[in-house]
């Protein structure tokens, strides 16, 4: 009887590992897909539930490396990217770290990307089938 339980537990563990690997591989496929310019909005929103925040950060970083705006729905090519890490505002007497901001073509794209990133589920990818599918909202254009 203990060997039956042991074998059953072993099979469950193997199934869980296979499921985990498949979810991670699917997330990687989505990252690669979202590196391309011209992603349709409905497709983008449908793919978000299958990735996690680290995957989304990878998308932004890889798009920047490819000289594309980090926001997956934007196809703008990045030109004249500032080389400095900080921006100094003399009028506000502040220093701003622009490391993340310079991955985007505009303030809107930066805000929209951060808005989406805040909605991406943080639960493990392989356990998402037990959750209700979230509904993602895009940042309106006039903000």
Swiss-Prot record:
Top-level EC class: hydrolase
The reaction(s) this protein catalyses: O-phospho-L-seryl-[protein] + H2O = L-seryl-[protein] + phosphate; O-phospho-L-threonyl-[protein] + H2O = L-threonyl-[protein] + phosphate
Domain of life of the source: Eukaryota
Function field: Putative RNA polymerase II subunit B1 C-terminal domain (CTD) phosphatase involved in RNA polymerase II transcription regulation.
One GO CC term, this protein: cytoplasm
Identification of the protein by name: Putative RNA polymerase II subunit B1 CTD phosphatase RPAP2 homolog
Binding site for Zn(2+): 69, 74, 105, 109
